[in-house]
């Protein structure tokens, strides 16, 4: 998808860019049977307390029900549209099965309108087809990867993401994947994945340009702790611009912010990670 840049009529538009949706999307209205109302939470829980800061005030939107499981085996589906989804970075495609059922799927890179895709154990290695990892050859890029059988895709679902199949382990029970982050991990060979990469890979190149666009997305300003009062943040207070006055930076709740491991050391999935993503940097 091409990047569209704007003339510098104002300072906000000087470096702003966006994706050229008209050149790549079909422009159809979303399928009403696959829409669900999406209430706004503004980062609050059921008590009205803020649990996630810097959220609120976004545009209203509907949630598109996405089929991450792809369990209609052996029934051909025809790609009808490539649409914009406000709830994710990737585009989505409306597919119509031969029995008449309509579903949304993540739109893979290179998929075409009118293309026929399949799900099943022994389908062809073609972009958009969904099959077990054990039946996909080495070197193939896949997305929408399951972590548990029939759970639905969990890994590699955002725009431009994918994982490469490196091979199988000695037992043949697991398939070894290399993720975009550089992490190498094992996944059960009976888990399914979709062949190809997720489309809309230029999403990461977009420059927001001005604060107003982030407000429409529901992202509120992030205020520095040192600019607050001492009753609002451990870094706050002082006459003018002062150091934080502590040995290490703190979170708003008084915990150390840097150098603390955020992943559980005894997490069960550690046994499946062959190489951590940080070891590749």
UniProtKB/Swiss-Prot annotation:
SMART domains: Ribosomal_L2 (SM01383), Ribosomal_L2_C (SM01382). The keyword rRNA-binding applies. GO terms for biological process: cytoplasmic translation. It comes from the Bacteria. Residues 222-281 are annotated as: Disordered. NCBIfam families: rplB_bact. Part of the 50S ribosomal subunit. Forms a bridge to the 30S subunit in the 70S ribosome. This is Large ribosomal subunit protein uL2. The gene is rplB.
């Amino acid at each position: 998808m091409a990047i569209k840049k704007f003339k510098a009529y104002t300072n906000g538009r000087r470096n702003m860019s966006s994706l050229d949706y008209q050149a790549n999307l079909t422009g159809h209205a979303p399928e009403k049977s696959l829409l669900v109302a999406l209430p706004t939470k503004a980062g609050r829980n059921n008590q009205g307390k803020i649990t996630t800061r810097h959220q609120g005030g976004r545009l209203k939107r509907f949630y598109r029900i996405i089929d991450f499981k792809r369990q209609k085996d052996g029934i051909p589906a025809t790609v009808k549209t490539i649409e914009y989804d406000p709830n994710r970075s990737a585009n989505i495609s409306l597919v119509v099965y031969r029995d008449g059922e309509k579903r949304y799927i993540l739109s893979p890179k290179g998929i075409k309108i009118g293309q026929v895709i399949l799900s099943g154990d022994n389908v062809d290695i073609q972009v958009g087809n969904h099959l077990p990892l054990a039946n996909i050859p080495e070197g193939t890029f896949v997305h929408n990867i399951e972590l548990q059988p029939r759970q639905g895709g969990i890994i590699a679902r955002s725009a431009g993401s994918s994982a490469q199949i490196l091979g199988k382990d000695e037992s043949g029970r697991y398939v070894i994947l290399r993720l975009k982050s550089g992490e190498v991990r094992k996944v059960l060979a009976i888990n399914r994945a979709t062949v190809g990469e997720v489309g809309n890979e230029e999403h990461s190149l977009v420059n927001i340009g001005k604060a107003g666009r982030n407000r429409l997305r529901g992202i509120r300003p992030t205020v520095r702790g040192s600019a607050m009062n001492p009753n609002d943040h451990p870094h706050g207070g002082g006459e003018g611009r002062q150091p934080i006055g502590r040995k290490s930076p703190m979170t708003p709740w008084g915990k150390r912010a840097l150098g603390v491991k955020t992943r559980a050391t005894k997490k069960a999935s550690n046994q499946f990670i062959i190489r951590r993503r940080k070891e590749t940097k």
